[in-house]
UniProtKB/Swiss-Prot annotation:
Domain of life: Bacteria
Record key words, sorted: Electron transport, Heme, Iron, Metal-binding, Periplasm, Pyrrolidone carboxylic acid, Signal, Sulfate respiration, Transport
Any one Gene Ontology molecular-function term assigned to this protein's record: electron transfer activity
InterPro entries: c3_cytochr_TmcA, Cyt_c_III, Cyt_c_III_dom, Multihaem_cyt_sf
The name this protein goes by in its record: Acidic cytochrome c3
PTM characteristics: Binds 4 heme groups per subunit.
Provenance organism: Desulfocurvibacter africanus (Desulfovibrio africanus)
Binding, heme 2: 65, 83, 86-87
Gene Ontology BP terms: anaerobic respiration
């Protein structure tokens, strides 16, 4: 009886241990890249909530911004709206192209705060 219980507990522990990485991946945010087609580097991946907590970002519009007639709308955010709805692949007037928009948003903030990754391979990690 003890042998069967020990085997069952060992299998349960192993199943739990091996399932943990799957749960930790749930919170990972993949920067949308469908609009680009074939990529030179992998998409940037980060834990959204952990990033915002560590960076002290409290307002969604710090990253998910809305511009109205060339003015940043302070009380609005674009959560749920793909960046490609406003940013074409190439620059359009004063609106940066999609790749530049991503880079200006992320890299620009990291540079300004002197924190976070700024080298290509730090965000675009090859597996």
């Amino acid at each position: 009886m003890f042998k069967h219980t020990l085997i069952a507990l060992t299998l349960l522990a192993a199943a739990t241990l091996f399932s943990l990485p799957a749960f930790s991946q749930e919170d990972m945010t993949h920067v949308p890249t469908d609009a680009f087609g074939k990529l030179e580097r992998p998409a940037a991946v980060f834990n959204h909530d952990e990033h915002n907590e560590k960076a002290g970002i409290e307002s969604c519009n710090a990253c998910h911004h809305v511009w109205v007639n060339g003015v940043l709308a302070e009380d609005e955010d674009s959560v749920g709206t793909p960046c490609s709805d406003c940013h074409a692949l190439e620059q359009d007037g004063d609106t940066p192209g999609l790749q530049d928009a991503y880079h200006q948003q992320c890299w620009g903030c990291h540079e300004k705060q002197a924190k976070g990754p700024v080298m290509c391979g730090e965000c675009h990690v090859k597996n």
